[in-house]
Regions:
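Catalytic-domain carbohydrate-binding cleft regions of carbohydrate-active enzymes
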Residues: 1-366
């Protein structure tokens, strides 16, 4: 069942539409089995061996699909035959070769205060987290990361049963609570005392509510940082830092995406810049990356292409899922990742991961 609801920021209006549909699992599975490799081929040079290995594998499978009588027993037998052919003749023989690794971390960025009221923020986080929990029931490999204890506090106050389910997923290791700060705070204007208290209250909440000692400062949507931050982080028991936007300079681009950031007192924290982006089109500037990524082949390829420290590491990161106003990953994201995890010819392979695992591996590589 699908519920579509739209409200306009410019006028008092609301539109609601409901649809009830039946998902054909067999056909849906074949759709993704064919679509994701085909999208991967579109990212490759048509003269490359990888391009033709993908197309040959798809052609063999498609030729087995009997379209003369859709949804008949013969049709479903042919669908299964096509999927078996793909697994045995393409995935097992042409995929999974030695390739870079892209960690895929489920994530939804929620601005606590931006283009909506705090009351709407409370609703956004409940809807987003509920979607995560329902998808976890359908996809046992799914892992999700979310920062900002303020959001968890909203859920605890307004949806205690939802909060109880989150606690259970945290215990199972499928829901990652990280980020260190109470909010993903601005780091230009606040005083040092303010930043210290962001971390104090953030880490205390995570420890008391989830039994988690946060070690990563997670600020994907913040626009600048105090040079005193490494010292503050180190003294707070935080030794890793992830961010995005400071790498967006058009002319004076920082030549590093993974490095040790040394503060004014000599304190150091391992720092990682997100490199998630689609492959740029011809003539398109390679400036922006995203923290609201997808697992599409174009983004898997573009994320690896953008990463600058290939001489040290063969791993990088996509945080996938709708964000800013919440929304989180979708079923489409997870189905797509299951196919990019094959290690499609010419592309990096992917795996569902956590922020902690990625940061630890990246730091170890350096």
């Amino acid at each position: 069942a699908y519920l579509y609801f739209y409200t306009s920021p410019n006028e008092i209006t609301a539109q609601c539409r409901m649809e009830l549909m039946w998902l054909d699992d067999a056909v849906d599975g074949l759709y993704y089995d064919l679509k994701v490799p085909l999208d991967a081929a579109r990212c490759l040079d048509k003269g490359s061996d990888a391009y033709w290995r993908i197309l040959r594998g798809l052609e063999r499978a498609v030729q087995l699909v009997d379209l003369r009588s859709p949804f008949s027993p013969a049709f479903y037998e042919s669908v299964e035959a096509a999927r078996t052919c793909l697994r045995e003749e393409f995935v097992q023989k042409d995929c999974g070769r030695e390739a870079p690794l892209v960690h895929c971390v489920g994530h939804t960025h929620i601005d606590v205060a931006w283009l909506w009221t705090l009351a709407q923020t409370r609703e956004k986080v409940q809807r987003s987290f509920s979607t995560v929990l329902r998808l976890m029931e359908q996809y046992p490999e799914y892992r999700f990361m979310s920062s900002q204890p303020q959001l968890y506090q909203y859920v605890k106050e307004e949806a205690p049963e939802l909060y109880r389910q989150i606690l259970q997923r945290v215990k199972e290791g499928r829901w990652e609570v990280e980020g260190a700060m109470w909010l993903e705070a601005d780091c230009n204007l606040p005083s040092g005392e303010s930043l210290v208290r962001q971390i104090l209250h953030g880490k205390r909440f995570m420890q008391e509510e989830f039994g988690v000692d946060s070690h990563i400062l997670w600020l994907p949507d913040v626009f600048g940082y105090s040079a005193a931050l490494p010292q503050i982080l180190r003294k707070s028991g935080v030794d890793q830092f992830f961010t995005t936007k400071i790498s967006w300079n058009e002319y004076n681009k920082l030549p590093y995406d993974a490095f040790l950031w040394q503060g004014i007192d000599g304190s150091e924290v391992f720092t990682s810049f997100g490199t998630a982006r689609d492959l740029p089109k011809p003539g398109e500037p390679d400036i922006h990356t995203t923290y609201t990524g997808t697992n599409e082949p174009s983004m898997v390829a573009g994320t690896w292409a953008r990463f600058q420290q290939k001489e040290y590491s063969d791993q990088t990161l996509i945080t996938f899922g709708y964000g800013d106003g919440g929304g989180c990953p979708t079923r489409h994201d997870l189905e797509t990742q299951r196919r990019t995890a094959w290690g499609l010819p010419g592309l990096p392979r992917t795996k569902i991961s956590t922020a902690g695992d990625y940061m630890a591996r990246q730091e170890a590589d350096l």
